[in-house]
Amino acid sequence: MRIGTDIVEIARITKAIINGEMAFYERVYTSHERLLINPAEPDYERASGFWAAKEALVKAIGCGFRDGVRFQDIEIKHDAAKAPYFVISGRLQEIFIGQGLQNNSLSISHCRTHAIATVIVY
């Protein structure tokens, strides 16, 4: 079992979204996530939480965003109780399985200025 945590300033992600426009959205967020964030009226807190969650996951796995691992390999969805969970694909899924990992748990939270995510992989 391993743990990963990430915290990000919401202002940082807000700036990246505003300055990067659709290029940032398309690089970092899946089409499902982009619908939840809503580019017409962006939910910067949610976008920041998703960013922190993806960073926390690669920290828990210990691989980072290199060697073919992309932000798009990680999708955040919500179950019937609105709890977030990951759908992992691509190179990251290969690494996850290759390390003998089978499951994960995700928690995301935010306040006015920061978003934080904690991930446990096991």
Curated annotation (Swiss-Prot):
Its cofactor is Mg(2+). GO terms for molecular function: holo-[acyl-carrier-protein] synthase activity; magnesium ion binding. GO terms for biological process: fatty acid biosynthetic process. It catalyses: apo-[ACP] + CoA = holo-[ACP] + adenosine 3',5'-bisphosphate + H(+). The keyword Repeat does not apply. It is found in: Cytoplasm. Keywords: Cytoplasm, Fatty acid biosynthesis, Fatty acid metabolism, Lipid biosynthesis, Lipid metabolism, Magnesium, Metal-binding, Transferase. Its EC number is 2.7.8.7. Disulfide bonds: none annotated. Transfers the 4'-phosphopantetheine moiety from coenzyme A to a Ser of an acyl-carrier-protein. This isozyme may be involved into a specific lipid biosynthetic pathway that also includes Z1545, Z1546 and Z1547. This is Probable holo-[acyl-carrier-protein] synthase 2. It comes from Escherichia coli O157:H7. The gene is acpS2.
